[in-house]
A protein has these predicted regions:
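Short alpha-helix
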Residues: 176-193
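A short acidic, Gly/Pro-enriched loop at the edge of an enzyme's catalytic core
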Residues: 107-116
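Class I SAM-dependent methyltransferase SAM/SAH-binding core
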Residues: 50-52, 58-104
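C-terminal lobe and adjacent flexible extensions of AdoMet/dcAdoMet transferase-like proteins
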Residues: 214-220
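Conserved class I S-adenosyl-L-methionine
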Residues: 1-47, 60, 144-176
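Conserved S-adenosyl-L-methionine
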Residues: 194-205
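A short glycine-rich, Lys/Arg-flanked "PGG" loop and its adjoining helix->strand segment in the class I
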Residues: 129-144
Length: 220
């Protein structure tokens, strides 16, 4: 069911535009707004680093990581998302893409990474009590976990339902997500062995939309 849900989502999510406002063909975007917010510097990695994205989708952020000289590994549950990533980036950068559930991939993975990240990805849609320990095990000493997602709705914390619409004749597909306020995220990360955890809500850019972006960073 979940694989079907994310394949359905893939058909609704447009491919990343060819260039950003600065004319760049690859870039890193933590937020739901184009040309807004910090970039890959949050990861603290560079040439020769090994970086994993959990829930890599169509690979736009991961491709930018690869252009910075890092080994870029991505895992996603959706075959449709990975096909789109391969079609877009195969002739441009080298990505190591794996079709799997993030928990399953991490359980069998023997590599370690300098950074693991998720942008509206697997960290949002996986129980942190199960996911965070497996990420912690695969991070090198001092390695970084960073992730972004929408902030929680006031009073709606923990496991929540998200709906992915289908045709008018079909019920939406349901996936679970985990929402917490910034102080609770830092507490959860510390409980699972992470250090120097920070969490903040980046404000939306000027304009009619007001919802910001939750950005969380912690070190192993």
């Amino acid at each position: 069911m979940t694989e079907t849900a994310w394949d359905t989502y893939a058909t609704q999510k447009p491919q990343r535009r060819p260039v950003n406002a600065a004319g760049e063909t690859t870039w890193f975007n933590w937020t739901q707004y184009p040309d807004h917010g910090p970039g890959a510097e949050i990861l603290g990695t560079g040439r020769g680093s090994s970086v994993l994205e959990v829930g890599c989708g169509k690979g736009g952020n991961l491709a930018h990581v690869a252009t910075l000289g890092a080994r870029a590994v991505g895992v996603d549950l959706s075959p449709a998302q990975l096909r789109a990533a391969d079609a877009r980036w195969a002739d441009t950068v080298e990505l190591e893409l794996h079709q799997a559930d993030a928990l399953d991939f991490l359980a069998r993975c023997t590599d370690t990474f300098d950074a693991v990240f998720s942008v509206f990805g697997a960290v949002w849609f996986t129980d942190p009590a199960r996911l965070l320990p497996t990420i912690r095990e695969r991070l090198r000493p001092g390695g970084v976990l960073a992730f972004s997602q929408r902030p929680p709705v006031e009073g709606c914390y923990g496991c929540q339902a998200s709906y992915i619409n289908r045709s008018e004749d079909e019920d939406p597909l349901v996936v679970k997500r985990w929402d917490y306020e910034p102080p609770r995220w830092t507490q959860i990360l510390h409980e699972h062995g992470f250090a120097e955890a920070t969490a903040r809500v980046l404000p939306a850019p000027p304009g009619p939309r007001k919802i910001g972006t939750l950005l969380v960073r912690a070190s192993a």
